[in-house]
Amino acid sequence: PTKQYPFSILKALDGLSAPVIGIAPFAAHTSKTYSKSNMEKVIYELQKEYKILLFGGGTEETEKLQELALSSLNVFSVAGKFPLGEELDIISNLNVMLSMDSSNGHLAAMLGIKVVTLWGVTHPFAGFAPFNQEPINNLLADRIEYPRIPTSIYGNIFPKGYELAIETIHPEVVVQAVKNSL
């Protein structure tokens, strides 16, 4: 860790008796964002054994994350509660980060944290995989069902029907990848 957790988060984590997983469930484009229902399945399984911190930004994401945290055990939203520097301190103390193809995964990787990344219509071979991460932690959409992936570098362009490609990554696979990274 580069720094310790801010005091207010330590209280929520109740002494750090379990590994802490960061989850950043949003991305700039919906084609790179796992559905709420699948993410809830992942969180439901992981919160049984681990503490989970939710990351995001902006009013809409912050509200969604707070709602998700309130409906789960061992799940806390840090969105909108800390300045960026303190959020980075929190990320630097995680055991693993689960992220979409988005900035939070890159920030965690730069801080030396293991990152499990979900890829929808983008692909890590396009050059944007988080730094120094195991390729096995890049969870990809089904390339047989969606053979045109990657459809774009940023995920903003995709053929009709590809917007749900990320949903071919099953929640059980995500949970196992996170557990294997601990």
Where are these regions (language model features)?
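Aromatic-acidic/polar surface patches that form glycan- and anion
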Residues: K32-S35, I166-E167
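Short, basic/glycine-rich phosphate-binding loops at helix/coil junctions
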Residues: V20-I23, E67, P150-I157
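Hydrophobic beta-strand residues in large extracellular and virion-surface proteins
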Residues: I21, I52-L53, V75, L139, ...
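Nucleotide-sugar donor-binding patch of glycosyltransferase catalytic domains
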Residues: V78, A109-L182
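A short acidic, often aromatic-flanked loop/helix-cap motif at beta-alpha or helix-coil junctions
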Residues: P6, P83-E87, R143-I149
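Mid-sequence helix-capping/hinge segment at a functional interface
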Residues: P1-K32
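Donor-binding and catalytic core of enzymes assembling or modifying cell-surface/extracellular glycoconjugates
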Residues: K36-V121
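Short secondary-structure boundary/capping segments
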Residues: A12-D14, Y44, A129-P130
